[in-house]
Amino acid sequence: MKKIQMITPIVEMDGDEMTRILWKMIKDELILPFVDLKTEYYDLGLVNRDNTGDQVTIDSANAAKKYGVAVKCATITPNAKRMTEYKLHQMWKSPNGTIRSMMDGTVFRTPITIPSIHPAVKFWKKPITIARHAYGDVYKSIDIKVDEPGVAKLIFEGESGKREEQVVHTFKGPGVLQGMHNTDASIRSFAHACFKYALDLKQSIWFATKDTISKKYDGRFREIFEEVFEEYKDRFAAAGIEYFYTLIDDAVARVMRSEGGFIWACKNYDGDVMSDMVSTAFGSLAMMTSVLVSPDGKYEYEAAHGTVTRHYYKYLAGEETSTNPIATIFAWSGAFRKRGEMDSIPELMNYADQLEAACFDTLNEGIVTKDLANLMEGVTPVVKNSADFIAAIRSRLEKRLS
C-alpha cells in the first residue's frame, strides 16, 4: 500500500505515563503503516520539561503557531507528590495552560458517542460540546496564605497615574486570599471563536456566568459576548441557530433537561469542571475529543483525559492494561483532517475519516477496553488489552483503506 504523502509537518507534542505508551502504539500500528508522517517533535514529558526549564513547552507552542496544526499527548501537571517522585527542580505550571495562554485559544470538547452506550442523563440524545475559555481566571491567579490579622487590598495603578483601591477583606486571623484577572481582548477572542464554531457546526450556543454576583468581572464577559454577537446575528438567523445567555446555575439545570446538540460556552473553571461531567455522563472521559482553536485559525488537538497514572504503574509492574486509546486516536485523526484541509490533501482527510470509522467499527462489534464494558447495552462486550484493541482497529482500518 502506497503511503499518503504530507506537505507541512504536524507539531507533535509527546507526553507522560500510560498515554505516552499508547502514543507510540498508535503511531506504530495506525499511522506509520499508512502515512509518510511529517512531524516537528517536542518531548513534553515531565522529565524533559524539567531538564529544559519548561522551555520545550514554550517552543512547542511557538511551533503550533508557526505551522497551524498540533497534536498533543496527555501530560502531568506536577503537584507536591510529583515533585518528590520526579525530583523536579520546581513545580512547573500546566503545559496545557501555557500553550492555551500563548495561543490565546478556546478549547472545544465533544463526546464521542456510539449507539450501544447510552448517556447517564436519559434526556440527552445528541452530543454537547463544551467551549472552554482557555485564558486567565483562577488558572492565572495569585494566592496568599495569611497567618495574622491584617487588611487585604485590591490596587490598580494605571499608566496615566490613575489609582484605584478597594479593601478585599479585613482579616481577624489566618485565612487565604486570591487575585485573578482576564482581559477584554481574550474574552473577545473567546466570543468570536465560539460564534464561528457554532456557525461551522450549525449549532446554537449557550453562554453562562454569574453576573448577578460578580457584576463587573462576570458582567464584562456578558457585555463583550453581546457586543460580539451583533456581528454574527444575521448569520445565526440565516443558519437557524441562536445565542442564549443565562446564569451558570440555571444553565446546569437546563442542560440536564435538554436533548443536547448545542455548544455550551463556559468560563475557564466552569469549562474545566463541566467538560468532565458531560464526558462522564456520555460514557467516559476517554471518549471525548478536545481541540484548542486560536483566533487566527491555529489548532491543537489532544485527548480530554489525563495520563492514566494507575494503569502506568501496572504497566511498569509488568501487568496487562486495558487503557482506552480512542480519544488519543481522535486527536491524531483531527490533526490529520485539519492538516489535509489546510494543505488540500483529500487523501489525508479521507485517512482521518477512515481511521475514526475503523474505531467505530471495532466498538460497534463489541470489541472494547475494560472501561467501556459495563456501559454497553444490546451488545456483548469482548474486553481486550490496549495492544489487542489497537490491533483490532488496525485490521478494520486496513480493510477500509484497501
Regions found by a protein language model. Give the residues of each.
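Glycine-rich phosphate/diphosphate-binding loop of Rossmann-like nucleotide-binding domains
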Residues: 6-25, 29, 154-246
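Glycine-rich phosphate/nucleotide-binding loop
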Residues: 255-354, 361-365
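Flexible, glycine/charged-enriched surface loops at secondary-structure junctions
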Residues: 35-41, 201-209, 233-245, 340-352, ...
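Internal helix-turn-beta structural module
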Residues: 317-323, 341-402
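N-terminal small/polar loop signature for handling phosphorylated ligands or for N-terminal nucleophile
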Residues: 46-60, 222-262, 266
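N-terminal glycine-rich phosphate/adenylate-binding segment common to multiple enzyme folds
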Residues: 47-163, 269-273
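N-terminal alpha-helical transmembrane segments of multi-pass membrane transport
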Residues: 2-8, 18, 22-23, 28-53, ...
